[in-house]
């Protein structure tokens, strides 16, 4: 076990300075433990003091507002020349000890927090029984007092009624109760109270605060200091409401703008000024005389040579009066008939072309060689005109063409019958066809021209040539 001794001790400094710091051997004289200022104004701190043995001492010193000082309430000793410290011995520490087991607050430098609470456990039954007995005694005493008071009050009421019957007075006048008879407490002035009790806001009951507030939007009416100088308070006008409404609601007639003469931009010459209302009538007659002189000059203009006459429009034809004699219009009817004929002929020509195309499509395609025919020359205008005029000639030509085609087909059938291939030639052709299938595309392409020359169709071509 260690031989160190531990004691809790309270260091104090009287009120007056701002800051007090405790230092000593416990912190190597570094001044790290400030004292706490209490409500009374003095400085205190409770901390544990360690002593190595019974003969050891605890040396310390105070730093008051930055000045190292020694307290007269503690013992002093001279360590060296000019240096003096306070100290504590074991006897000083034992005298100031309190009840053991009190809890300390380490953050507050070991300040006492109070006695430790009692250990948890069931409450004692003896205390409960004692409390119940005491409560019963109190209740019984209160009941006795209440019964005595009721009896006294009933006796006093009976006595008062007897006295009233003898004197003939009523019991309307009743003495005041205890609350009514107690005097009111005199109001105490706030200024005479203790210095610690004060109000946050001062109360000034002066005449200025009782007056109305002149600020706009504040409480009370606005009082102007110079009402006589303001015109709105003195001037009064009498206005008739009907007259004012009629005058305001009256619609003012707006004059319409006069449309002036429109002058075209193409006119370059200045036109003569129009006569005004104030001018004499003679000037207008002169203007009319000048206009009449200009009209015959316009009529005297001769027409140009070889000028085409304008055709009459349908509007002009309508505007001709009925009294004038109208010749029969034969030329217009003829032109209409010609147009109808041309349209019908065009339709017939289109139908003929369609028939010719269908006939060409219906031609029989055979395996016979094609004979070179001379190209057909385009028809001239005369031939087309003749074909249109004489449909019988075109029918004869078509019959001739059909006969020629039939004769050609008969000749082809006869030649094919005469030159039918024999059985050997057929076998050769089958062998050649099989060789064609097995041959490569390159060899087949090279042998094609030779086959054309030696084939059956080649011989037929030579005959027709």
Curated annotation (Swiss-Prot):
* Residue numbers carrying Phosphothreonine: 182, 295, 366
Provide the alphabetized UniProt keywords: DNA-binding, Phosphoprotein
Its GO biological process annotations read: signal transduction
What are the recorded GO MF terms, alphabetically? Answer: DNA binding; protein kinase binding
Task: From the UniProt entry, list the residue stretches annotated as the region X-DNA-binding.
Answer: 160-161
Biased-composition ranges, Basic residues, are 127-148, 451-465
What is one term from the GO cellular component aspect held by the record?
nucleotide-activated protein kinase complex
Record's compositionally biased regions (Low complexity): 166-177
Which Pfam families does this chain map to?
Answer: AMPK1_CBM
Q: Where is the composition biased (Basic and acidic residues)?
A: 337-363, 385-398, 404-428
Residues bearing PTM Phosphoserine: 153, 156, 271, 319, 343, 394, 440
Post-translational modification here is noted as:
Cleaved in the vicinity of position 160 to give an X-DNA-binding N-terminal subpeptide and a non-DNA-binding C-terminal subpeptide.
Where composition is biased (Acidic residues), the residues are 156-165
Which residue ranges does the record annotate as region Disordered?
107-227, 247-275, 305-465
Question: What is the documented function of this protein?
Answer: Cruciform DNA-binding protein which exerts an enhancing effect on the cleavage of cruciform DNA (X-DNA) by endonuclease VII from bacteriophage T4.
Belongs to which family? Belongs to the CRP1/MDG1 family.
Query: What name goes with this protein?
Result: Cruciform DNA-recognizing protein 1
Species: Saccharomyces cerevisiae (strain JAY291)
Species lineage: Eukaryota, Fungi, Dikarya, Ascomycota, Saccharomycotina
User: Corresponding gene?
Assistant: CRP1
